[in-house]
Amino acid sequence: MYEFRLNRLINSQQNLITQRINGLYCESANTWIDPYKPVEKAIITHAHSDHFTNGCREYICSIETGFLLRKRFGNNLNLKTIDYDKEFLINGINFSLHPSGHILGSSQIKIKAGSEIWLITSDLKRQKDKTCKSYEKLKTDFLICESTFGLPIFNWEATNEVVDSITKWVTQSEDSISILFCYSLGKAQRLLSELNSQNFKNIYVHKSIEKMN
């Protein structure tokens, strides 16, 4: 989740996005982004549970995120789904959703007000991933960037190196059952995609993963 202190931005004509007790808030549009608690109107960047709060009156998200939210949290959600790159107005403030490359349906939120452009990245990934649209590089005046693993100590191996390591391990253990643990939405689909490309047979998944596939 987002953790930052934003009192006033130098050179900004307005504090378009502020941090409140419920999360990131666009007061001009009376709209929250990935709120921590139930609110009137919420834009949801993706379907991971740490970015979604049940009980909001209205949700706005990408089409794919809407599909996943209904599968995870039920069909009674009041969802408005928006295509990527399509602008929409809320109280005169211009919003649009753009791929963040994190998981299926994940979005950056671009906000335009007057001459200023703000961008909220949410979780993002710049590596290629067959299971979702690639991260879209956008121009912005002010950037609010999710940085869960932003410290230099986090240095991930390339995808092909990880896949090669897993493939080698599973192949060497072909007389046994190999069990891989991963998050049910995002990591699981990415791993399945890579394993399928290696022509592994008889891959079974937990019911929580099957629900998301």
Task: List each model region and its residues.
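Accessory terminal helices/loops
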Residues: 171-173, 178, 189-213
